[in-house]
Amino acid sequence: EHIPYHGKKLAFTNGREALTNQTGKIVTNKSGDKILGTTLWNGTKVVDKNGNDVTAANQNYISLAKFDPNTSKYEFFNLQTGETRGDFGYFQVVDNNKIRAHVSIGTNRYGAALELTELNNDRFTYTRMGKDNAGNDIQVFVEHEPYQGTYHPAFTF
């Protein structure tokens, strides 16, 4: 339950650091939702800030990603089987195509706001916390390219 607030005047904080990571071109003259919705995306690899491949330690980020810009639905599918991973919900790209936010209503309910470091028709990449090959927490970059395989998964919700 919510009621109107009539206390002192509130202001937004300015505490967020600038989002400056970039691994490639970020298209800003087209809706990020529409860019993501143009194709099925294949998570191809995960690298650290020095470009070292850490995909093996971050397999949970490798999947097929489907986005619908009209309904704001997203769903992640298993790369080997094309079956749902049970991670689905709603997404939106905001802040001049610099942030992809999504809320999962699937098996694991969670929300994430991830910095996009590349977004165009050929690739999209985001950064988040992941693991190095020794299991330590590090910043990683998850790369995606348009899917070229035979699966045509449909949303399951």
Predicted regions and their residues:
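Lipid interaction determinants
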Residues: E1-D87, N97-F157
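Short beta-strand-centered aromatic/proline hotspots
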Residues: G89-Q92
